[in-house]
């Protein structure tokens, strides 16, 4: 079976937690390409949650995903120093539909501000505007402690955990098989973070932050996480971006 995932510290540790991944063909992709790959062939993918909206045919695992319930997450917002009014924000890193759609909604709902969103591939420090960074660079470069957690903003908005990614497939059978693949995933996932030697490239302050907060990250979904998924994919409807409310095909 092929398994597609975006690449970040959390997904890497999901893969490292699998008891027997020799039968899996695992491939890390940019987050924006995972769903496309899942649609092209019978496979399992950890897709950005808002991709459910444009891919209603996909079956969604009700048991496994990547959910954030506090400050630790994969995306942080950084404000330009001395900025009194927020008008523009630049997105960079491993972007997907989640960040491009939710950034505007977050600032509209929580700050009553209509922001203009742009994309950039420039180095983080060369961008002098407000910015949102997705991925490991938040930690490897030590930026995170200056940033505002996107998960905290989303949690405040939907009153539920921020499920950033969900496991999905065109095949009901593959979703069924995933329960065996991810059996006892949570304890093995957390164990990966208990040994600091298993995390390379992180400065000490980032390593300590991740380890101290890792239990706010969930890879085995509960009812509150499923409610978080439902609330998240309804936000674009409430803001007039889509015409109908989408119901995930949970299995």
Mark where each language-model region is.
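Bilobed "Venus flytrap"/periplasmic-binding protein-like clamshell domains
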Residues: 1-20, 72-128, 227
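Paired acidic/hydrophobic, glycine-rich loop segments that form the ligand-binding mouth/hinge
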Residues: 4, 42-49, 129-135
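Short, glycine-/small- and polar/acidic-enriched structural segments
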Residues: 12-86, 95, 99
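General small-molecule cofactor/ligand-binding pocket signal
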Residues: 25-29, 116-120, 246-248
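Hydrophobic residues within well-ordered alpha-helices
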Residues: 37-40, 125, 236
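Pocket-lining segment of extracytoplasmic ligand-binding domains
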Residues: 118-200
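Secondary-structure end/capping motifs
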Residues: 174-239
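Long, low-complexity C-terminal extensions of enzymes
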Residues: 241-251
């Amino acid at each position: 079976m092929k398994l597609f995932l975006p690449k970040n510290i959390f997904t890497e540790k999901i893969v490292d937690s699998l008891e027997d991944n020799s039968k899996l063909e695992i491939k890390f992709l940019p987050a924006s390409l995972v769903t496309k790959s899942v649609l092209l062939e019978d496979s399992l993918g950890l897709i950005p949650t808002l991709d459910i909206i444009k891919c209603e045919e996909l079956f969604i695992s009700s048991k496994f995903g990547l959910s954030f319930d506090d400050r630790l997450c994969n995306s942080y917002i950084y404000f330009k120093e001395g900025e009194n009014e927020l008008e523009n924000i630049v997105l960079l890193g491993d972007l997907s539909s989640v960040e491009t759609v939710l950034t505007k909604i977050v600032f509209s709902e929580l700050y009553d501000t209509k922001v203009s969103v742009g994309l950039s591939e420039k180095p983080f420090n060369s961008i002098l505007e407000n910015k949102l960074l997705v991925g490991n660079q938040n930690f490897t470069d030590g930026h995170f402690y200056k940033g505002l957690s996107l998960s905290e903003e989303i949690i405040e908005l939907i009153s539920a955990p921020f499920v950033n990614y969900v496991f999905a497939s065109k095949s009901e059978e593959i979703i069924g098989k995933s329960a065996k693949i991810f059996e006892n995933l949570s304890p093995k996932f957390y164990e990966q973070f208990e040994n600091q030697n298993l995390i390379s490239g992180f400065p000490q302050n980032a390593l300590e932050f991740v380890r101290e907060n890792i239990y706010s990250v969930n890879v085995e979904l509960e009812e509150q996480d499923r409610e978080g998924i439902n609330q998240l994919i309804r936000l674009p409807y409430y803001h007039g971006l889509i015409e109908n409310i989408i119901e995930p095909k949970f299995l």
